[in-house]
Each structure stands twice: as structure tokens, then as C-alpha cells.
């Protein structure tokens, strides 16, 4: 069966690339102890050698603080080997067992407990499905009490590759283990703030321990974006690392010259002499210079051979050398002026006619899209086939190209990856961490999400204002919370029903993002956009994912209502929502809330004390009254002539 699942070149053909066992050595730390097939072709199954791109694998598979838990699960992402291909999705189950319980105790086991992790490296993001299978196998592997018995791991590899395929992404099983219901119950209306925060491509750090809660919350947020889990993460772990800024000196010479870009005049287009487009591929993973390859992306029959190129052609300037001050210069490939050019609509018509000439598979996701900037007042026609996201999109342009061009998604970050947070080649990230050192470095992120407390710490006051939900947004969030909380006790729902269930919540966010995108295409749309937040939409239009989406046409959006799903007149209930939101999120509101809780507690305690005091006084008064009445009835005549003596 192994031959059946592997091609003639020895490359695995199934979705599962490797089964790996990672252990903790008392001297060497975390290390790979077994891999099937071997991580390095030609090495043995017990080789400790790692590919350079996967050097952090042991620290991801056996995360920080693993010794504090008997067992747990972690999701992580690895970059592709040699810069080719897509993200590798890792799912790891780790356990620990007492050393004295082992049937075969190896010489290097010197501690009382043994920690090991079994992980699957897959080409498909089937987190929950692989986790369910892996937990069973890991339990059986530990029950053997002899870690040299690896036959069960080989069987796991063969079984997964024979039972899983690309069709696994089409059903709901891709969302197995990712529960938006639990997310809404925990974060309530703040879920929409998280959604918008990622739309803006900000640096977002999730923090909680244990790691299973961390990766579950982070990936569940991403599952709210249509198509993101299935097709939007193929480029989420790729970036262009650079050892030091001093190496940038060599990059200036390797920048593509002006001749590497295409410009066409009106006359050129009329003669259909488009020729061959040259594309520039950026070097990946330590390559200091850009590689230039010439490939015919589209060919048109040449009817004007022998003509010399026009010397008056304007050329697109090459991207500037990256620097800490402008780390996004290499990633942004569309000039903002394109969005504002009044003649763009006419130019787009020509560009859209050429779009179907670009085979989707012919342009790698890491290549720079082919674009030609508009030349104002030159009479030239601009060829804009559309920015290429490299993702498999639907008719609405989903998933959005958020996790592309250096914007990373790292469900779990090991401490050894800390440098990525400050790397100038990383545009941003959505990352998870369990180590408190990440949380303390607040200057390296735009927002820290405290999952345990359902708290979102946004450091920049301007960003807080920008993400402040509108009245329509608050209605939308309240609508979600009410439907989820009303059905939370339904034993038959369990997240699988429709209204208030997981699929229903994802459908609501799909309606929201579709309406938002449709609203941005409307003319005179200021009033419509105000329901989404005018400043938010303005900031979003400057992001890479929106520019890529807006540079291509999506006719299906013409059928979408651009109005906010919860637009309407302001009412008293809106005032209550706004007050509730302010109390829960503003610093002053939190203080007021804490004071109210403290005051309420003190009132209750004081009431009990007063009750006890009043009760005692009433009993004493009752006794005194009874005694007085008794005295009054027995000596009436005496009490009428002279008052009884009263003791002080």
C-alpha cells in the first residue's frame, strides 16, 4: 500500500505528509524521535535531523508548560519545504506517563515521567477530524508502554492517506471541533470586534493556557470568515526571513529593473501585440536575491513582428528596498491611486477581458502579481488583470486574501519563534501563545486577546475608536448572543442545529461580510457605510486583502443587499445596548461595574447584620413588653397612683 500512496519520485501523494513522534530529552530538550516517512529523504526513521524550514517543529509539537497537563492537543502551522507549495498543517497530541509504568525503559529516561507527542503533518486543514483520530492512536501508543512499537504509527499514516482526500474540505467536517456557539457564549458581542480586527490585518495575539483552549478559540474566530479554513490559509506561514538589516545592501542590486515590468500604449493594444509577460518571483527563506524567470503567462498572435518597442513607454517602478520604516512596501502591489482613478472603470473592461487568460495554477501564491500602474494624462491604457491572491475563491471573492504576503496565522507560537513578532518582513499576524513573555511584550502587537477573561486589550486609542461598534453592529451582536443563549440548554441542539447553532452563526457572518463588500461598491454610499463604521471602512480599504478583492470583479455581489443587516432607526433598546457595551468595555465602565458589585455585596452583608441586630432588639423589646404587661395587670391600682420604678 505504501507504493500506492507514493509516486515514482518518492513524494507522498496523500494529504498526510508525515507522522512524527517528539520526545523530551533530559539533556537535549525537545527533539524528533521518529518520523514516517523520514523528514529528510534517505535518513532513517529515528533520525533527529530536521529540515531548516521546520526547525521549530519539536517546540510546537511539545509546547511550553506541557508538563503541567496529563494530555492536550495543539494545532500549528509550518512553512512549505524549499519555499514551494502551501502551508503544512500540524496537529499534535501529547501525553505523559510515569517512567516506572513502562515495560521497556530506555537508558536515556532519567526522570519520573516521560513526555511524548504524536503529531500529523498534513496538507489539509482538517484540525478537528485529525485530532479525533490522533487522540485515539496516541492513547493506544501509550498503552503499549513500549515506545519502540511503531507499527501502529505506520498504520495510522496508511489509514489516513487512504481515507482522507480533497473532498474532506467540502463538508462540515472541516469545522469539527470549532464551535462558534461557545465562542459567542464566551466573548458575546466582542466576537464582532475580533472579526473586524483581523479584517484590518492588525497584529493580534491570543493568550491562554492550556494550549488546546488557545488554538480552539483562535481557529474558531477564523472559521467565521467564509472559506478561510478551507482555502484561505495556504499562504499563512510564508514570509521572507532576513538574518539582519545589514544584508539589505545586497538587495538593492538584485531589485528588478524597470524593463522587467510591462506597459502598453493604446497602439500596442490595438495591434494585439501583448507578447510575453515576465514575472518576478520573490526569493523565499533566506534567499538574498530575487529570482527572475520568464514564463509566457498569456500569448496573443503577434501581427506586428519586427516593430521596435516604443521608447516613450512608461515603466513601473520596482518595489523599494524594505526597511523598518516601510516594511509593507514590498507587499503592497496596488497603488491606492488606482482605486481613485476616475477612468479606472473604462480601463478595467480591457483588463477583465484578459483575466480568463491567466491560468490560476500557473501563478504561484508567493509570486508578485502582474500589475501595471495607471499613467495619468498620458493616453495609455493600463493592463490590470487583477491582483492574484493565489487562493481558491468562490463567486464572491471569498476567502479574502488576508493571510497572504507576509501576514501570518500561527495558532501556536513557541518561545523560539518570538523574533517573528518584530521581523520587518512580517506585515502582521494572528498568533497564539501560552508563555507570559509574549503577553508582556505589548509593543510588538496591536491587540492582546485574553481568552480566559474574554478581554481584548487594544493598545492604540485611535484603533479602539475605529473598532467601536456602531448601533447596527451592536444589534447584530445582540442578535447572535440572544439566539445562542436562548438555545444553550437545548440538549438536542448541541451546536449542530440551525438557529443558534454553529452553522447558523457562520452563515450570519457570511451575510455580514457579503453586505459589507457590496456596500463598498455602491455610489454615494456614505449613509450605507456609516452603519458599518465609516472610519473602519476607510481603514479597511487600505488593507492588502481589500485591494486584492477590489481589483477583481465579482458579479455575484450585484444580487447582495448592501445595507447593513440590522440598519434602522435609533430606539430605547439601542440605548440599553450602547450602555451595556460601554460598561463592559470602557475603563470607566469597568470601574463603575466593580463599584456596583462591591456596593451590592456590602449592602447584602450589611442587611444581614442589620437583620440580626434588629431581630435581637425586637426580641428584647418583646420580653420587656411582656414583663411590663404582667406587672401592669397585677398591680393596677398602684400603677394608677404612682409610676413604677424604672431601672436605668
Curated annotation (Swiss-Prot):
One of its GO terms (cellular component) is recycling endosome. The modification Phosphoserine is found at residue 244. Residues 299-336, 349-372 are annotated as: Disordered. Its main location: other. The modification Omega-N-methylarginine is found at residue 588. The keyword Phosphoprotein applies. The keyword Transmembrane helix applies. Residues 306-315 have a biased composition (Polar residues). Coiled coil: none annotated. Belongs to the AVL9 family. Functions in cell migration. This is Late secretory pathway protein AVL9 homolog.
Amino acid at each position: 500500500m505504501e507504493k500506492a500512496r507514493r509516486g515514482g519520485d518518492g513524494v507522498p501523494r496523500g494529504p498526510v505528509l508525515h507522522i512524527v513522534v517528539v520526545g523530551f530529552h533530559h539533556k537535549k530538550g525537545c527533539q524528533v524521535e521518529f518520523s514516517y516517512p523520514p523528514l529528510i529523504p534517505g535518513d532513517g526513521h529515528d533520525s533527529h535531523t530536521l529540515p531548516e524550514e521546520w526547525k521549530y517543529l519539536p517546540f510546537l509539537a511539545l509546547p511550553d508548560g506541557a508538563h503541567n497537563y496529563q494530555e492536550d492537543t495543539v494545532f500549528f502551522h509550518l512553512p512549505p519545504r524549499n519555499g514551494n507549495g502551501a502551508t503544512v498543517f500540524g496537529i499534535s497530541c501529547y501525553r505523559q506517563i510515569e517512567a516506572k509504568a513502562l515495560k521497556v525503559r530506555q537508558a536515556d529516561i532519567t526522570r519520573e515521567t516521560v513526555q511524548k507527542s504524536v503529531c500529523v503533518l498534513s496538507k489539509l486543514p482538517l484540525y478537528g477530524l485529525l485530532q479525533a483520530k490522533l487522540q485515539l492512536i496516541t492513547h493506544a501508543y501509550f498503552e503499549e508502554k513500549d515506545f519502540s512499537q511503531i507499527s501502529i504509527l505506520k498504520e495510522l499514516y496508511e489509514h489516513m492517506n487512504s481515507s482522507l482526500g480533497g473532498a474532506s474540505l467540502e463538508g462540515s467536517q472541516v469545522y469539527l471541533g470549532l464551535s462558534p456557539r461557545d465562542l459567542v457564549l464566551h466573548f458575546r458581542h466582542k466576537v464582532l470586534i475580533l472579526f473586524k480586527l483581523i479584517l484590518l490585518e492588525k497584529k493580534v495575539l491570543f493568550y491562554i493556557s492550556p494550549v488546546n483552549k488557545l488554538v480552539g478559540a483562535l481557529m474558531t474566530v477564523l472559521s467565521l470568515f467564509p472559506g478561510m479554513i478551507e482555502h484561505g490559509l495556504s499562504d499563512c506561514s510564508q514570509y521572507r526571513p532576513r538574518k539582519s538589516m545589514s544584508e539589505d545592501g545586497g538587495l538593492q542590486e538584485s531589485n528588478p529593473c524597470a524593463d522587467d515590468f510591462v506597459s502598453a500604449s493604446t497602439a500596442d493594444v490595438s495591434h494585439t501585440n501583448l507578447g510575453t509577460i515576465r514575472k518576478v518571483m520573490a526569493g523565499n527563506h533566506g534567499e538574498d536575491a530575487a529570482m527572475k524567470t520568464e514564463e509566457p503567462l498569456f500569448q496573443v498572435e503577434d501581427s506586428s513582428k519586427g516593430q521596435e518597442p516604443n521608447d516613450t513607454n512608461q515603466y513601473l517602478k520596482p518595489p523599494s528596498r524594505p526597511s523598518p520604516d516601510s516594511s509593507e512596501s514590498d507587499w503592497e502591489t496596488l497603488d491606492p491611486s488606482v482605486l481613485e482613478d476616475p477612468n479606472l472603470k473604462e480601463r478595467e473592461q480591457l483588463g477583465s477581458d484578459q483575466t480568463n487568460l491567466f491560468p490560476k495554477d500557473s501563478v504561484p501564491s508567493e509570486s508578485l502579481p502582474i500589475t501595471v500602474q495607471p499613467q495619468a494624462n498620458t493616453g495609455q491604457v493600463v493592463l490590470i488583470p487583477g491582483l492574484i491572491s493565489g487562493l481558491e475563491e468562490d463567486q464572491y471573492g471569498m476567502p479574502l486574501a488576508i493571510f497572504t504576503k507576509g501576514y501570518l496565522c500561527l495558532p501556536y507560537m513557541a518561545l523560539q519563534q518570538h523574533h517573528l513578532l518584530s521581523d520587518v518582513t512580517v506585515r502582521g499576524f494572528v498568533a497564539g501563545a501560552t508563555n507570559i513573555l509574549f503577553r508582556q511584550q505589548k509593543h510588538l502587537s496591536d491587540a492582546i486577546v485574553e481568552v480566559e477573561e474574554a478581554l481584548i486589550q487594544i493598545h492604540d486609542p485611535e484603533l479602539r475608536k475605529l473598532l467601536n461598534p456602531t448601533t447596527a453592529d451592536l444589534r447584530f451582536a445582540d442578535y447572535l448572543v440572544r439566539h445562542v443563549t436562548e438555545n444553550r440548554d437545548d440538549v438536542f441542539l448541541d451546536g449542530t442545529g440551525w438557529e443558534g447553532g454553529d452553522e447558523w452563526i457562520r452563515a450570519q457572518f457570511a451575510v455580514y461580510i457579503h453586505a459589507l463588500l457590496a456596500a463598498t461598491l455602491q455610489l454615494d454610499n456614505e449613509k450605507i457605510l456609516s452603519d458599518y463604521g465609516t472610519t473602519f471602512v476607510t481603514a479597511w480599504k487600505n488593507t492588502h486583502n481589500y485591494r486584492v478583492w477590489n481589483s477583481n470583479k465579482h458579479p455575484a455581489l450585484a444580487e447582495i443587499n448592501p445595507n447593513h443587516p440590522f440598519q434602522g432607526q435609533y430606539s430605547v433598546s439601542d440605548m440599553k445596548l450602547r450602555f451595556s457595551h460601554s460598561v463592559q468595555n470602557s475603563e470607566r465602565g469597568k470601574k463603575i461595574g466593580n463599584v456596583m458589585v462591591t456596593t451590592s455585596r456590602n449592602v447584602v452583608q450589611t442587611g444581614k447584620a442589620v437583620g440580626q441586630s434588629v431581630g435581637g432588639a425586637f426580641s428584647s423589646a418583646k420580653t420587656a413588653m411582656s414583663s411590663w404587661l404582667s406587672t401592669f395587670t397585677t398591680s393596677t391600682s398602684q400603677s394608677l397612683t404612682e409610676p413604677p420604678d424604672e431601672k436605668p
